[in-house]
Amino acid sequence: AMVCAAKGYPLVITMAESFSIERRRLMRFLGAKVVLTPKEERGIGMYNTAKKLAADNGWFFAGQFENAANADIHESTTAREILADFQDSPLDYWVTGYGTGGTVTGVARALRRERPNCKIIVSEPHNATLLGSGLPQERNADDSPNGSHPAWEPHVIQGWTPDFIPKVLQEGIDSAFFDEVRPVDGMKGMAMAQHLAANEG
């Protein structure tokens, strides 16, 4: 939304009606049009609505859940920042969650190549263990998700673990990038984030 605002590009964002008012307001503040989807349709409903709107109107669809450029940019930027921060010291663990899968896959590529001893730990909600379940994601011919993953249940942190395994994340699974998948209680995760912000900056 910030890039579109800076470049003057019109932007339409789909959001489930269960998303926070603050998130909607921020997107609108940045000039985006927000289209709400029924909360019962989960993330897959937002995805399908965005895809249909783009197709019906001739708009560009970013397809961030399938677009390889998502992981590529994190491999060439985010990973470089992390490695630069640990240039003169060991990097024992990298712990992350996932949304589209771009950050975790892109950074994991670089860590596997340049810091092979670093343990990569992926967290997901304790009540939405998509990776931990070992169950595959059903996909359409274009690699888009064919419905919600059977292990997903609603959880408290928006943007963390959608109700399907993104194609971008599938690369990390297939390449065995992850040393461990750790389920985390969302409420405990938020409490720890507040603790870290207050005590570590």
Describe each region flagged by the PLM.
Residues 1-53, 130-145, 166-172:
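Active-site-proximal loop->helix
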Residues 1-7, 104-114, 118, 123:
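Short Gly/Thr/Asp-enriched flexible loops that form oxyanion-binding sites at enzyme active sites
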Residues 9, 32, 59, 116-118:
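Short glycine/serine/threonine/alanine-rich loop segments
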Residues 47-48, 57, 113-200:
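Active-site/ligand-binding loops adjacent to catalytic centers
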Residues 27, 82, 120:
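Conserved hydrophobic/aromatic pocket- or pore-lining residues that grip, position, or stack substrates
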Residues 57-102, 106-110, 171-175, 179, ...:
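Active-site/ligand-binding-proximal alpha/beta "capping" segment
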Residues 14, 37, 64, 121-123:
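Generic beta-sheet signal
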